[in-house]
């Protein structure tokens, strides 16, 4: 046990620093959003003037360095949240270019890559293209730049986590490099990030390095293990508004959607998310170090970001 703790001690100290930074930032987000007890009450019916719902959007927008956010309990999963964002932004004949290879399993059917489900992106005439990863699972930046320059896609799509494959997850540095390449090769392309499992594990946010819109799940990091369900979309205000029109109806957007008494748990989840996410990260680092000592090959290594 002592040996296992000593091995990754520098990494654990680094995570503690990230944890403290993001927790203080979340506290500031609550202050900036003016969160108070009355925001914990729910609404019914149409949900007009649900001040708690609106304050929660402001909290996540601040925490993620975004212009706006759409945080709702009725996002059923991360895949559902991503699908709403994709349909909110893309139109028939648009092209979505994945620069991190094949997306993970659950989003493929929504795109139209697997199965023949009605209502997929493919069903609506939206095109999907991708740039394969290198043999070692890292991003092929040269190929990405060439494809973006040639195709000028409506959307450049980045998947941050490894999903269900064995490849490195992306840090903000890789995301920043992809954003720089995209904005230089095709300034009008919208950069979208699947940020599932990527919240609060670094000090630098994807929005601050060039991402235009991102989405994730409250069932994972962003809900702090307290949010019972839900998801979020955050980014540029006009893009978030487009996604809100897809979630509800054009014209009403973020103005409707009863919270049904879920606000309190969602606020609690947001508050604890920076702490809980880093505790989970420390557990993963410890487990990786332990099994490496026992002679196992581990991925990711305890020393990886």
Predicted regions and their residues:
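Conserved PLP-enzyme active-site core in the AAT-like
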Residues: 6, 26-32, 36-39, 47-48, ...
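N-terminal glycine-rich, Lys/His-bearing helix-loop that initiates the first secondary-structure elements
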Residues: 1-33
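Active-site-flanking structural segment that lines cofactor/substrate pockets
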Residues: 40-70
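Generic structural motif recognizing short loop/turn segments at the entrances and edges of beta-strands
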Residues: 67, 124-127, 305
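Early transmembrane hairpin of solute transport permeases
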Residues: 72-74
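Active-site loops and adjacent core secondary-structure elements that bind or stabilize anionic groups
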Residues: 5, 300-305
């Amino acid at each position: 046990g002592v040996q296992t703790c000593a091995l990754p001690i520098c990494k654990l100290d680094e995570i503690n620093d990230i944890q403290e930074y993001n927790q203080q930032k979340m506290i500031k987000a609550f202050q900036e959003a003016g969160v108070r007890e009355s925001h914990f009450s729910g609404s019914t019916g149409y949900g007009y003037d649900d001040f708690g719902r609106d304050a929660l959007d402001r909290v996540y927008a601040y925490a993620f360095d975004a212009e706006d956010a759409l945080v709702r309990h009725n996002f059923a999963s991360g895949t559902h949240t991503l699908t709403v964002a994709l349909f909110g932004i893309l139109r028939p004949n648009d092209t979505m270019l994945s620069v991190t290879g094949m997306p993970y399993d659950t989003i493929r059917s929504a795109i139209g890559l697997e199965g023949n489900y009605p209502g997929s992106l493919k069903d609506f005439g939206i095109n999907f293209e991708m740039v394969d990863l290198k043999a070692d699972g890292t991003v092929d930046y040269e190929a990405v730049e060439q494809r973006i320059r040639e195709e000028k896609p409506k959307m450049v799509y980045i998947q941050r986590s490894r999903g269900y494959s064995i490849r490195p997850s992306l840090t903000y540095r890789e995301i920043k490099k992809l954003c720089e390449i995209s904005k230089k090769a095709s300034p009008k392309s919208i950069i979208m990030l699947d940020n599932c499992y990527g919240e609060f594990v670094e000090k630098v946010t994807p929005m601050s390095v060039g991402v235009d819109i991102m989405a994730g799940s409250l069932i994972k990091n962003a809900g702090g293990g307290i949010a019972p369900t839900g998801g979020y979309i955050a980014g540029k205000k006009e893009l978030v508004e487009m996604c809100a029109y897809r979630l509800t109806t054009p014209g009403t957007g973020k103005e409707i959607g009863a919270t049904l008494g879920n606000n309190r748990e969602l606020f609690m989840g947001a508050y604890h998310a920076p702490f809980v996410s880093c505790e989970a990260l420390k557990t993963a680092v410890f487990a990786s170090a332990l099994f490496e000592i026992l002679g196992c090959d581990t991925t990711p290594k305890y020393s990886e970001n």
